[in-house]
Amino acid sequence: MNKKTPKKHSTLSNTLFALKWQFEIAPGYTVFTLMQTVLGDVVTLFEHTFLTAYIINCVEQKKTLTDVLYFLIPVAIAVFIKLMLNTFFDAYIAPGEREKIQMKTRMRLYEKAASLELARYDDSGFYNDFVWAMQKAPDHITGAVGAFNTLLSRITVSIIAGAYIVSVDASSLLILVFLMPFTYFSGRAINKRAMKMQEEIVPVQRRSDYVSRIFYLADYVKDLKTGNISPKLEKDLSDSTEEMRAIVKKRQKPIIALNVATNSAAGLIISGVYLSYLFFKALVLGKFGLGSLLGVYNSTQTLNGKVLTAVSNLSEFQNHSLYIEKLRRFSETENTMEDNGRLALPAGGDIVLRNVEFTYPGNSEPTLKDVSCSFKRGEKVALVGFNGAGKSTLIKLLLRLYDPTGGKISYGGENIKNYRIADYRGCFGVLFQDYELIATDLARNISADNKPLDIKKADEALKKSAFWEKFKTLPNGYETQLTKEFDESGFNPSGGEKQKIALARVLYADSDIIILDEPSGALDPIAEYTLNKTVTELSSDKTVIIISHRLSTTRFADKIYMLANGEIIESGTHEKLIKQNGKYAEMFRLQAEKYR
């Protein structure tokens, strides 16, 4: 797979992407929050600035109460409506809508992840984007939309405040023309330094977060308790904290200095020079009343504050954009594995590999070389070999998790690419070496879907997987919760018990082709014997493929393929390979020595 440098989108483009994403999920919520933010700030401007100025002017001009109420009542109604709508919306509507955005965003990502070929997960860049998108995307989608709403609100309020200033005293524009660029560029300088500080903190924070996870994740508990690595990890955590403090101390000083200088200069200009100018025009020249003076002064303060916070908001947009960029890269990733097969899948068929080669993406050396073999319907076939021989890779190719880089795999006489991937994979029941059980009830772990459990089939699967005796001791039967993740009374199966449940899942599926990757790895001798008996007793139309290092499991196979360095070096029955006295026989004798 050729890796292309992904196109990087602008902050504006990523913000619009977030808006579109959220609007598709919750259009009403998206529109209302925009109106709530913009109109809410406009109402606040009228309430705190224009209404006060109007009332003072009315008093100064000795106008009637009716004149005051003419403006006061509409503003009061607007404030009341704003408060009522905000209270109702924030308490009853927003929580559910935010949860919907979170849930549907994750569902989109889950569906995208499920549609992509396994090779994508070998790409560390892709996997990193996937993890970040899963963890951070929902918050940064809503965060970017919120930042956009706030920016639009600030622009709207600034335009209204500016228009009011010009309507009262057009010459104030000279002050604003000087003040606004000063505020803008000062804000940019502060923002640039804040972003630099954040960029330096992020990698240190990630190291700190990683060490923290080691201390609270159950996966590491046994190693922490039996080893002596805790002091080292605690030192790493302390060092990370000190490093972040040093970065903040170093970078915060110029930020504080710029903030103080900006606020002091703006305060001197607005509260000193500009306010004196307004008093001169109002009291000496009589150009406008005290109410208008207060309105213009407050509008100028508002305008200056909105410009400064709008500039500081740029860092917020950039921060959201970093995560949305990862979300976009992930969501726009195309599946390079073709899935345009149209042939109907036969009820059963042989699998044949001809001169199959495979090289993992990013590797130069092939993992499989010129592999030719067959798995006939009803056969029990074993794949054996030392670690790294290519056995698990061969299984991934059979399942079409990867496509061969050379040669062909056929099923029922047709290239497997001629079938729909979902139909083809539906033929298989697989117990992977790194299988997982889900923190839900036993029934769902066996059925692996939402259909009602067939109790008779499930009972038979548990008996064949040697879990039946343990199952009879579980008070809640198939409703037993596995693990204590969500239920304190849940059942925590041992390693061997987990493997038996996972095997029962495969047997319950009753697939035409069963693949067992190290099925006896965690089983005791009695359970291993039961497994061997189960495999040999499976109906004659079931193809069973077993990968195992324990040759006591594979000796009952109809055919054995011995792999080494990505090639099949021996094949035949157990008896035939023993007589050949090759690598298989050598491996078998080495294992047999342990039991003498």
Question: Which residues fall in each region the model found?
Answer:
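Membrane-integrated ABC transporters
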Residues: M1-T44, E60, L65-Y70, D90-A94, ...
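Helix-to-loop junction immediately C-terminal to a conserved catalytic motif
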Residues: L398-L399
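A hydrophobic transmembrane-helix motif
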Residues: V43-Y54, N149-N191, A246-Y297
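An intracellular "coupling" helix at the cytosolic face of ABC transporter transmembrane type-1 domains
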Residues: E24, W132-A144, K196-P203, R213-Y216, ...
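C-terminal portion of ABC ATPase nucleotide-binding domains
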Residues: G477, K533, R550-R596
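Cytosolic ends of transmembrane helices, especially the final helix of ABC transmembrane type-1 domains
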Residues: I229, L293-E332
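ABC-fold ATPase nucleotide-binding domain signature/coupling loops
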Residues: F130, P366, W468-I501, D510, ...
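ABC ATPase nucleotide-binding domain helical subdomain, centered on the C-loop/LSGGQ "ABC signature"
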Residues: K408-S410, R425, A443-E488, N532, ...
